[in-house]
Amino acid sequence: YGSRVHEVIHSISRTDLNAILLDAAEATGRVRIEFGAELEAVEFDQSVLRFTDGRTEPFGVVFGADGAGSRVRAAIASQGNCRFETRWLDHGYKELTLPPADDGSHQLDPNALHVWPRGEFMLIALANPSRDFTVTLFAPTPTFEALRSPDAVREFFVSEFADFAAMVPDLVDQFEANPTGPLGTMRATGWSHEDRAVLVGDAAHAIVPFHGQGMNLAMESVRALDRHLRELPDDLGAAFQRYECERKPDADAIADMALHNYIEMRAGVIDPDHMARRSLELELERRHPHRLSPRYNMVMFSTMPYAEARDRAARQ
């Protein structure tokens, strides 16, 4: 996907990665992991976490990694320290599964991201080790609202994605059984409360998935937070502030670029002018690798901060 042989994109199972991270945390001997514990509220005045089952736990510092609908963020906001806004796209998504072929092999090339761009909507497919594919339809909300009957679903896929429809015998059943998910961007300012709580991951910066950078953004933020905590071990509040000052510009930058990449994926790749520009960018990078690089390549294949990649691309 870049101009160099090593510029590839690796797709891994989120479930497997979560298991690896949980195992690593548990192996330290300093982490107690509890499943099925749903946070209801953070009570700063009493220094307790309250859970939906009525249980409470005392705390010293809370690291809120509880996702886009973060209860920790809501608690920080209640103290007047955090402001946040979620902007929803008038688009949604639905996941489907492309099964293995009759002989157990992949039905499509497993070493590629497959995209069926259709202007206002698109279908993408990523291979799994089990030789099936996770397929996602991204489309405007009115499109999903029009697909209310089996006949409408069947007609839509046969008309727009005939090759895909022919490979999935239970397509209609899958479509009706699987939920339609929302797509939105959450931006926040004030990621911490004194030296008592701090946000990480989607709780601080939730973005749409079209650049494949949401988890990377979160991990980069955790690395930055860790560095500031090591530099200021006796002043957590200052460490939290420095962490946000460093990461907020990059979070906003990749949020914008992810939204732009949705347009590029569903419409740009079928625009001859856009593709000609892309080819020119790659050729210029090949000839002048230290002077020019496409924005996509800077984001995906370098450790350049997101804001720097955005600004450099704008100058080019």
Model-assigned labels for residue ranges:
Residues 192-209:
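Short FAD-binding loop at a beta-strand-to-alpha-helix junction that anchors the flavin cofactor
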Residues 11-12, 33, 56, 216:
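Short aromatic/basic micro-patch
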Residues 3, 203, 212-213:
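C-terminal lobe/hinge of AMP-binding adenylation domains
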Residues 65-66, 200-202, 220:
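Active-site flanking residues adjacent to catalytic metal/cofactor-binding acidic residues
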Residues 1-24:
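Active-site-adjacent segment of FAD-dependent monooxygenases/related oxidoreductases
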Residues 22-23, 28, 34-183, 187-193:
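Conserved FAD-binding catalytic core of PHBH/FMO-like flavoproteins
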Residues 227-316:
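C-terminal helical "tail/cap" subdomain of flavin- and related membrane-associated enzymes
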Residues 209-221:
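A conserved FAD-binding loop/helix module that cradles the flavin
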